[in-house]
Swiss-Prot record:
This is Argininosuccinate lyase 2. It comes from Agrobacterium fabrum (strain C58 / ATCC 33970) (Agrobacterium tumefaciens (strain C58)). It is an enzyme of class 4 (lyase). It is found in: Cytoplasm. One of its GO terms (cellular component) is cytosol. Its EC number is 4.3.2.1. SUPFAM superfamilies: L-aspartase-like (SSF48557). Its main location: cytoplasm. The gene is argH2.
Length: 504
């Protein structure tokens, strides 16, 4: 038995029933759920190019165009059930073409192309649309953050480091930090889209074709910026996938940190963020509870999005530099789940940011009892009393410890400890009276004197808001240019394809 050639004795027929159910059916369903329009556009653009270059004559092109139109009219993709009669969605369309116009004419549509370049083009068409949808939502969030920051440019909050009260700043200043990160995240998406926006069509299997194809024309008709130059890269490179999901991963890692702060700031012990009733749920047993659970949902959805994007990168890891299924159908469909949860986060976070507010009484209480304006006392001693910062820091630290020990607050209970600490270290009396002391340690003064570039004082914040709105405007303008380009090329493709049918 060992001497029998398995190739000669093999009587099995494709597809194996287990393979059909575990691989082919999910791939077929993924294609019909996500890529029908992409297949349609690719077939039409390729056909127009074949006719324009003279590879196909007018009569043949017209027959194929008519058959493609008839398939659109008579087949509802959502109702298709995979039977195993054909390998995949591509071969289903080819089968339907053959049934309408015969094997010879139908087969000519596949001249100078392969499922390799078709597949990567499909995935790029799908990713471009999803990137555009997601970045539109990111721009809505960016606007919501800018609006909230401007509304709160003078609203005091406690800023934390290492989980402890550190210094006062404004909510507008804090949100502006998140704005700048989001701007960079959107820029990463823009760069990823530039990579996606290069057409693989015309690479065929690996090395292009001996036919006089026009790759740039197909790219243009499909709305791409240009063809991707190297044909091997067209079918082997996965950086369009890794760039996209890398951008998602980073955006939702960063947003997750903002969300975590919001969760902390709404806790009873901190309480500096107030969440309105419309975004609060109650307990089924504890009458006093106001649970801001949308923030919890934001946190886990951001983490899910991060995890899904990370999974896409993990799947690409250590794969061969060639065309391979690891980067294709099912993997691409899996990645779309990251876009779905990402969109939910962006929508909900934009709504939340527009509705939350700062509780000024809690902020004032937390500032007073935590002595977080004490840094300015040290700075003022350097400027007013000509001490070294280390001397000033020692005096300020002594004052803070005394106030905390008294369970008091710095403006009301800090002056007497300050007098003792100052004279004890310097051997002289201070020129700062109690009124001046109160001014120095007030949070309003703390913010006002931090007027350098990037600080929370009004002047640098006004400059910052102008810069942020400029960035938002630039993002909107670029998105509109892309939308106009895609629409114009879609219209041109429809016009050129329709013209083919006139030769019948």
């Amino acid at each position: 038995m060992a001497d029998i050639n398995p190739r000669q004795s093999d009587t099995s027929k494709f597809p194996d029933p287990v393979y059909k159910e575990t691989v082919l059916r999910p791939l077929f369903d993924g294609a019909k759920n996500h890529h029908v329009d992409g297949f349609r556009r690719i077939d039409r653009a390729h056909l127009v190019m074949l006719r324009e270059t003279g590879i196909l004559d007018a009569e043949t092109a017209a027959k194929i165009a008519g058959a493609l139109e008839d398939i659109d009219r008579t087949i509802e993709p959502s109702e298709l059930v995979y039977t195993g009669e054909v390998e995949d969605f591509f071969f289903l369309i080819e089968k339907e073409l053959k049934a309408r116009i015969g094997v010879d004419v139908a087969g000519r549509l596949h001249t100078a192309r392969s499922r390799n370049d078709i597949d990567h083009t499909l995935f790029k068409i799908g990713l471009k649309d999803k990137i555009d949808t997601l970045t539109a939502k990111a721009r809505v969030l960016l606007k919501a953050l800018i609006d909230a920051a401007e509304r709160n440019q003078s609203t005091l909050i406690v800023a934390y480091t290492h989980g402890q009260p550190a210094q006062p700043t404004t909510f507008g200043h804090y949100l502006s930090a998140a704005i700048e990160v989001l701007i960079r995240d959107i820029e990463r998406f823009t760069e990823a889209r530039h990579i996606v926006d290069l057409s693989p069509m015309g690479a065929a299997a690996i090395t292009t074709s001996g036919f006089p194809i026009d790759r740039a024309r197909v790219a243009e008709l499909l709305g791409f910026a240009a063809p991707l130059r190297n044909s091997y890269s067209c079918i082997a490179a996965v950086d369009y996938t890794t760039a996209t999901y890398g951008a998602i991963e980073l955006m939702f890692l960063h947003l997750g940190r903002l969300i975590q702060d919001f969760q902390f700031w709404t806790s009873f012990e901190v309480g500096q963020i107030y969440v309105p009733n419309s975004l609060v749920q109650i307990s089924s047993i504890m009458p006093q509870k106001r649970n801001p659970v949308p923030i919890e949902h934001l946190r886990h959805l951001a983490s899910q999005t991060f995890g899904r994007a990370r999974t896409m990168l993990d799947v690409m890891h250590n794969t061969p530099f060639t065309d391979m299924n690891d980067s294709e159908g099912e993997t691409q469909s899996m990645g779309y789940e990251a876009f779905a949860s990402a969109g939910r986060v962006l929508d909900l976070l934009a709504s939340l940011v527009g509705q939350i507010s700062i509780d000024p009484e809690r902020v004032d209480q937390n500032i007073r009892r935590s002595c977080i304006t004490i840094t300015e006392l040290a700075d003022s001693l350097v400027r007013i009393e000509d001490l070294s910062f280390r001397q000033a820091h020692e005096i300020a630290a002594t004052v803070a410890k005394s106030v905390v020990a008294l369970k008091g607050d710095l403006p009301n209970d800090g002056y007497q400890p300050f007098l003792g600490a100052f004279s004890g270290l310097t051997g002289r009396e201070t020129g700062i009276d109690e009124e001046k002391f109160r001014q120095i340690v007030s949070p309003e003064h703390f913010v006002a004197v931090r007027s350098r570039f990037g600080g929370p004082a009004p002047e640098p914040m006004r400059e910052a808001f102008a810069a942020y709105r400029g960035k938002l405007g630039a993002f909107e303008a670029e998105a509109q240019r892309s939308t106009n380009h895609e629409a114009a090329k879609a219209a041109e493709l429809a016009e050129k394809f329709t013209a083919l049918t006139g030769a019948r």
